[in-house]
Structures are given as C-alpha cells and as structure tokens.
Amino acid sequence: MKKYKLSNQEVAQILEDFLEGRGSRWAWDDYTLGMSFEDKHLEDIRIRCVGLSKEFPPSNPNEYCNEQGRDVLRGYIKQLRASN
C-alpha cells in the first residue's frame, strides 16, 4: 500500500469532515481503508479510527460510532490542529 505524506492539518480536516457529515461519499473509507501513513502518529490515529465502530458501537445503525467515539475524533482533531 502506498504511504501517504499528509500534514496534521490535512488529517484533522478529514476527521472533521467525517464528523460533520461533509466531504465525499467515500472519503472516510479512503482514509481508513485506502491509506497508510509514513508518519507513525498519523498511522496510529488512522488505525484507531478504523476500530471506533467496534470500540464504541453506535445505537443508531446509520452512524459509525457512538458519542464516545465521536469524542475520540474531536480529541484527535484538537490535538492535530494544535500541532502544526
């Protein structure tokens, strides 16, 4: 799999777009399943995001994860935006 070199800000935007329901229809799948990052921290975040639906199962079948999982995403967004 190709290793991507995205910035912290770019990854934060992907997470925020997913959380807010913006972005393309397949952007989340592209991020979680179709990418791999050279930066270990960004790769660790991606891997954690892959498992959020199992770690924090949604009560609504139309959602990816529950509120606790969304809080994890918000935490990553805040962390990534703070670390230019």
Sequence positions of predicted segments:
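Acidic, Ser/Pro/Thr-rich low-complexity regulatory regions
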Residues: M1-N84
